[in-house]
UniProtKB/Swiss-Prot annotation:
GO cellular component term of the entry, any: cytoplasm
Protein's name in the database: Probable cytosol aminopeptidase
Family: Belongs to the peptidase M17 family.
GO biological process: proteolysis
InterPro entries cross-referenced by the UniProt entry: Leucine_aapep/pepB, Macro_dom-like, Peptidase_M17_C, Peptidase_M17_leu_NH2_pept, Peptidase_M17_N
Length: 497
């Protein structure tokens, strides 16, 4: 599934033979230090001539790939542009790592991480490795003939000023990459493979990292009173599950945790309110929010994060059947609040309602964040490059926004006003599960807010970014694994001690 990229660290003085040599230049095309020494005069002259003929200006995210000249111990020279001095000062190291891995392809390469004015830290180098690992990902185990080999199997030797420091920092980055890759794998799996019981089994594998796992089956959910979640699952031949993951990494195990909640609808046909056939195959990705939670717990446990975090996901399949829940049904949620079903395709909020209520009642978290591919309306509003953020807490909202900006997973805060809450009032129950056509993402968030008590809470609607998102230098996958890097950054900056 993953590309299996190998990354090693060597001092800048290291020299080798064969493979590619990767060097970096600004818009002045200047080579200096170790890069100039490795290329020598023949290599430097070739770069100048080729740049002129190919109109290579050294702009950021541009590259020149050349056969190595005689006298240079390499097969190819890969010259990567960094742009102007201003561009270099704001280098996105994760994207640079992905771009570099893309240019190297499935080859071996010595990458000289040094250039004029270079001031990269071990953390920057670690981010570079994260990007390279994410770029090398592929999901092709169901292909029996042509595999996706073009960027897989690369071996990068990074020549850096502090190999031991970079290697230590890169271990954490590797843990995050594992979490993103796990999330991508889960989203990409077909629903006949990743049905609820199998999903719960895969979550249970996190015990090998020290994560405590509890799986709630149908009997336990009925005992608790999770009527909203169970209603969604009625039409499926596959029983639902709730998977709860606890990572206790803080020095004080009794410290209240951060809670992460995910929607895990492994396939959403729409139920009785069935979706149109066109694009229904994408609904295997309607569990992208839950995948982000599972991937984050993996990353935190793998890097031994000094924080207490609980993750909980509701895993169901929404299918039409003689036993399916129907429009006009009234179901009772775990909170005791009743819900009139208007549209069975607005099922994710019912799943989240019971899980949110259970988590805050059981674990008394210091904050709750839920992630869900919840509404098409958020795609209309924000497209496929940014997630919608709804929150009852300005401080938490600001922290999430900053973490997303730093991690390259951007969010945009959306309004939560009384009018949206009023739109879900029902004539027959405490609320209805849709608020009509207008403001669909906001009325869905208002629905969830009714299941949040006095705790800082944020809802991330990731329908646009969680699946079939815009390709980038670090993602060529249909399932992006969106949210893992944001949440890991959030925990690192605000919840670790």
């Amino acid at each position: 599934m993953a590309g299996g990229i190998e990354i090693a660290f060597e001092p800048l003085s290291s020299r080798g033979r064969g493979g590619d040599v990767v060097v970096f230049v600004g818009d002045d095309l200047a080579l200096s230090g170790p890069a100039a020494e490795i290329l020598g005069r023949p290599g430097a002259e070739l770069v100048v001539r080729a740049a002129a003929s190919e109109r290579f200006k050294g702009k950021a995210q541009s590259a020149l790939v050349l056969p190595a000249p005689a006298g240079v111990e390499a097969d190819r020279l890969v010259v990567i542009g960094l742009g102007s001095e201003k561009d270099r000062a704001k280098t996105d190291w994760t994207l640079l790592g992905g771009f570099t891995a893309g240019k190297v392809g499935g080859r071996s390469a010595r990458v000289v991480l040094d250039w004029p004015g270079y001031a990269g830290s071990a953390r920057d180098v670690a981010d570079f490795t994260l990007g390279a690992r994410l770029r090398s990902y592929r999901f092709d185990q169901y292909k029996t003939k042509k595999k996706d080999e073009d960027e897989a199997g690369a071996a990068l030797s990074l020549l850096v000023a502090d190999p031991s420091g970079a290697q230590a920092a890169a271990r954490d980055a590797a843990a995050v990459a594992e979490g993103v890759i796990l999330a991508r794998n889960l989203v990409n799996e077909p629903p006949n493979v990743l049905y609820p019981e199998e999903y719960a089994r895969r979550v249970s594998e996190l015990t090998s990292l020290g994560v405590e796992i509890e799986i709630l089956d149908v009997a336990r959910m009925k005992e608790l009173g999770m009527g909203a979640l169970l209603a969604v699952a009625q039409g499926s031949a596959r029983e639902p599950r709730v998977a709860i993951m606890r990572w206790n990494g803080a020095d004080d195990p009794s410290e209240p945790p951060l809670a992460l909640i995910g929607k895990g609808v492994v396939f959403d046909s729409g139920g009785v309110s069935i979706k149109s056939a066109g694009g229904m195959e994408d609904m295997k990705g309607d569990m992208g929010g839950s995948a982000a939670v599972v991937g984050t717990l993996h990353a935190l446990a793998a890097r031994k994060a000094k924080a207490n975090v609980v993750g909980a996901i509701g895993i169901v399949e929404n299918m039409p059947d003689g036993n399916s829940y129907r429009p006009s049904d009234i179901v009772t949620s775990l909170s005791g609040q009743t819900i009139e079903v208007i549209n069975t395709d607005a099922e994710g909020r019912l799943v989240l309602a019971d899980v949110l209520w259970h988590v805050q009642a059981t674990y008394k978290p210091k904050a709750m964040i839920d992630l869900a591919t919840l509404t098409g309306a958020i795609i209309v509003a924000l497209g496929q490059d940014i997630a919608g953020l709804f929150s009852n807490d300005d401080a938490l909202s600001a922290q999430i926004t900053a973490a997303g900006e730093a991690a390259g997973e951007k969010v945009w805060r959306m309004p939560l006003i009384p009018a949206f809450d009023k739109a879900i009032d029902s004539k027959f129950a405490d609320m209805k599960n849709t608020g009509g056509r207008h403001g669909g993402a906001a009325t869905a968030a208002a629905f969830l807010k009714r299941y949040v008590n006095d705790v800082p809470w944020a809802h991330l609607d990731i329908a646009g970014v969680g699946m079939s998102s815009t390709p980038s230098e670090i993602n060529r996958s249909w399932g992006a694994g969106w949210g893992v890097r944001l949440l890991d950054r959030l925990v690192r900056e605000h919840y670790e001690r």
